[in-house]
Amino acid sequence: MEAYFATFRSPGPELLKVGFFTLRWYGLLIAFAVLIGLNLSNKLASIKGLSKNLINDLLPILVISSIIGARAYYVIFEWRNYSGSNFWSSIQAFGLTISIPTFIKVWQGGIAIHGALLAGTIAILIFCRLKQEDFWDVLDVLIPSVALGQAIGRWGNFFNNEAFGLPTDLPWKLFIPYPYRPEFFLDNNYFHPTFLYESIWNILLFLCLISLIRLSIKGKLKLPSGSLSCVYAIIYSLGRVWIEGLRTDPLCLGGVPPFCIGGIRIAQLISTILFGLGLLGLFWIYQRKKKLPSLGIIGRKHQ
């Protein structure tokens, strides 16, 4: 007997539609993740002794830059789907048909977490310099919320019927409707729920980071500036390299999905680099007993 209780099936990307207004699950999940992250980061910032309202001031810049970065990163590596005859698209609004570049339609999916991390990091760098805050302290305060936000946001992939893995008959398989299946797998009904794998992995990562913070508060562990961010880079990258190998829609360098034959999966490459940087960072902090490079950021003004 098939274990239907463990088979996933998306109800669709839209939660509510009234006239031209559409509330999508993905957008709702991102908003939910941002609110939770704001509350958590403010608490951690208070424990860290950072400036009051620092996170509140940073949040709008961080959210906007991360969304732009996530979309731009995806579009760059998938440009073949947004160029030529695919460059222009149309939307219906206020009874009008409006032509817009296709890459603007972010609500249809197509974002990459590594792009968000890159753009977000740059935004934090600039913000910290302007506010005279220590970059690594601020990043360490934010990083648990990043992990938790990723765990929540991955469910947006579930509702959008995207970012799923290779075909499988495992009890926890994910049903993908025919229109969403890759051309290579049109005859397959069930696929690995890679969104679930990464969501669970990120929850475990979040719990690990919070546990380290608690040990630090109790005086049982020293967490120098940047150490928490290095732990995130190591653990997240380990999971992403494995999970990315299952996906049917990877961003490829020198190849094409679903297998990137003749090329490499970008996410695996970036994750490998981040893993190495994370290890190097922890070695620098705990073995060399040195602070991580300041990256040109001025020290905290209230120290």
Swiss-Prot record:
Gene designation per UniProt: lgt
Q: Function, please?
A: Catalyzes the transfer of the diacylglyceryl group from phosphatidylglycerol to the sulfhydryl group of the N-terminal cysteine of a prolipoprotein, the first step in the formation of mature lipoproteins.
Record field: transmembrane: 18-38, 58-78, 107-127, 193-213, 266-286
Task: Identify the residues that bind a 1,2-diacyl-sn-glycero-3-phospho-(1'-sn-glycerol).
Answer: R154
Report the EC code(s) recorded for this entry: 2.5.1.145
Q: Entry's Pfam families?
A: LGT (PF01790)
| A GO CC annotation given for this chain | plasma membrane
Native species: Prochlorococcus marinus (strain MIT 9211)
User: Its pathway?
Assistant: Protein modification; lipoprotein biosynthesis (diacylglyceryl transfer)
Primary residence: membrane
What does the record give under GO molecular function?
phosphatidylglycerol-prolipoprotein diacylglyceryl transferase activity
Protein name, as recorded: Phosphatidylglycerol--prolipoprotein diacylglyceryl transferase
